[in-house]
């Protein structure tokens, strides 16, 4: 079974219109020339507009230095009109993404990627998985789970969440010798490698649950997931298409986290008066 993630996420997003977003502002910093990022950013800006939050995109050239970008982030940290900051990944090769992420004030970390992010803020991909799990009553207990790919915005936070939650989970990366053997026996598989249609239906067992997290463009410049959809309907019990599967729920998580930060900062301001 697959589903229209965009439609379901949109229906949940509509409920956020009831909140007062007049003093909420999201700033997205883009320091890359990545086509996929353009698509992701567009969806985030549309979501902000839908609920009534302000948003701004700061697009930087490849001439930006590490020091200049950190200075820009610090300036946004101190801007009382900015509620949340997103550093859109990836960044230009000459930039150190980890140092840049750590420069973001945890009180403005919408993505939940800083080391000291607020306890209430989950990484957006994790929040998306939790929402889907609850929405479709997916059972993770006593299931063999495999996460393929350990990127900072995909597989890594998913693996850490599953592990700390006590689920039976294994992680695979490019150095894992028996990845295909592991996923063939898995009940639930998360793919997050960003390689167009790398996995085929034959790689999974009958009745598997599949979360296709990775996004890339094929030779025709079309957005694709890690899993080739051909034959998947007959193999998987439940799966997410890409695009339109997990992605809309990560955007929904951004809006949820932005509101949490707004409320947190409002309480901090009130307590200081």
Curated annotation (Swiss-Prot):
Role description: Catalyzes the oxidation of 5,10-methylenetetrahydrofolate to 5,10-methenyltetrahydrofolate and then the hydrolysis of 5,10-methenyltetrahydrofolate to 10-formyltetrahydrofolate.
Catalyzed reactions: (6R)-5,10-methylene-5,6,7,8-tetrahydrofolate + NADP(+) = (6R)-5,10-methenyltetrahydrofolate + NADPH; (6R)-5,10-methenyltetrahydrofolate + H2O = (6R)-10-formyltetrahydrofolate + H(+)
A GO molecular function held by the record: methylenetetrahydrofolate dehydrogenase (NADP+) activity
Subunit structure and binding partners: Homodimer.
Membership in a protein family: Belongs to the tetrahydrofolate dehydrogenase/cyclohydrolase family.
A single BP term in Gene Ontology: L-histidine biosynthetic process
The protein's annotated pathway: One-carbon metabolism; tetrahydrofolate interconversion
Knockout or disruption consequences: Probably essential, it was not disrupted in a global transposon mutagenesis study.
Keyword Oxidoreductase: yes
The organism's place on the tree of life at top rank: Bacteria
Enzyme Commission number(s) of this protein: 1.5.1.5, 3.5.4.9
Keywords assigned by UniProt, alphabetized: Amino-acid biosynthesis, Histidine biosynthesis, Hydrolase, Methionine biosynthesis, Multifunctional enzyme, NADP, One-carbon metabolism, Oxidoreductase, Purine biosynthesis
Protein name (Swiss-Prot/TrEMBL): Bifunctional protein FolD
One Pfam family this sequence matches: THF_DHG_CYH_C
Annotated residues for binding of NADP(+): 149-151, 215
Gene Ontology CC terms: cytosol
């Amino acid at each position: 079974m697959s589903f229209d993630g965009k439609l379901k996420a949109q229906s949940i997003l509509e409920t956020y219109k009831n909140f007062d977003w007049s003093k909420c502002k999201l700033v997205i910093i883009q320091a890359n020339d990545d086509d996929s990022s353009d698509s992701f950013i567009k969806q985030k800006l549309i979501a902000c507009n839908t609920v009534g939050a302000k948003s701004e995109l700061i697009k930087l050239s490849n001439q930006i230095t590490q020091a200049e970008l950190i200075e820009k982030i610090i300036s946004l940290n101190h801007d009382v009109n900015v509620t949340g900051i997103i550093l859109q990944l990836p960044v230009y090769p000459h930039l150190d993404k980890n140092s840049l992420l750590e420069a973001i004030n945890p009180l403005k970390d919408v993505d939940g990627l800083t080391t000291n992010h607020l306890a209430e803020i989950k990484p957006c991909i994790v929040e998306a998985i939790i929402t889907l799990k609850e929405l479709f009553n997916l059972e993770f207990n006593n299931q063999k789970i495999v996460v393929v790919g350990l990127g900072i915005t995909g597989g890594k936070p998913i693996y850490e969440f599953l592990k700390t939650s006590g689920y039976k989970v294994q992680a695979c990366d490019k150095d894992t010798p028996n990845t295909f053997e592991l996923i063939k026996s898995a009940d639930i598989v998360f793919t997050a490698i960003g390689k167009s249609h790398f996995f085929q239906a034959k790689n999974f067992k009958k009745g598997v649950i599949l979360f296709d997290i990775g996004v890339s463009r094929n030779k025709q410049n079309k957005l694709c997931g890690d899993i080739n959809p051909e034959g998947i309907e007959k193999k998987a019990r439940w799966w997410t298409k890409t695009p339109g599967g997990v992605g809309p729920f990560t955007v929904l998580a951004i809006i949820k986290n932005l509101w949490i930060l707004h409320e947190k900062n409002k309480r901090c301001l009130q307590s200081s008066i």
